[in-house]
């Protein structure tokens, strides 16, 4: 079975790859491809946040009693990223290459820092504290 750190880190890499593909399409002004890649990225990101916020974070908080700790910080960062995603949506809709590329750089840095915190600290803590973690991941893989 796949562990929480393994599965969620792989999802980070998959999101990063799609994000980079969208950015490359915008840089070439291939707006049709950019929209397709961006929509795919946004869907993956939304699903990833949902898996964390609706399932993993509550399970971790219940297991540890920590509700004002790392999961609260991650939720706040998710909100910041959601706001940037909305700004990127607007830049893409306007076919504003410079605005999109500037915002995408900001989002990429934010995602890298965020992912590092999850991968180095939170996911290993989840693996230690969520008793049915592998079963939860198996459910994610099916859906």
Give the residues covered by each predicted segment:
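Small-residue-biased structural context
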Residues: 1-143
């Amino acid at each position: 079975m796949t562990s929480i750190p393994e599965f969620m880190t792989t999802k980070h890499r998959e999101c990063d790859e799609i994000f980079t593909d969208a950015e490359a399409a915008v840089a070439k002004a291939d707006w049709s491809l950019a929209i397709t890649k961006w929509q795919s990225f946004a869907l993956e990101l939304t699903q990833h946040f949902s898996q964390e916020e609706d399932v993993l974070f509550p399970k971790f908080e219940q297991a540890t009693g920590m509700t004002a700790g790392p999961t609260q910080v991650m939720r706040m960062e998710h909100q910041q990223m959601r706001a940037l995603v909305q700004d990127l949506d607007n830049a893409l809709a306007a076919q504003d290459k410079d605005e999109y590329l500037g915002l995408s750089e900001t989002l990429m840095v934010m995602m890298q820092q965020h992912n590092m915190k999850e991968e180095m600290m939170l996911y290993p803590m989840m693996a230690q504290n969520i008793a049915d973690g592998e079963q939860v991941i198996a459910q994610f893989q099916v859906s």
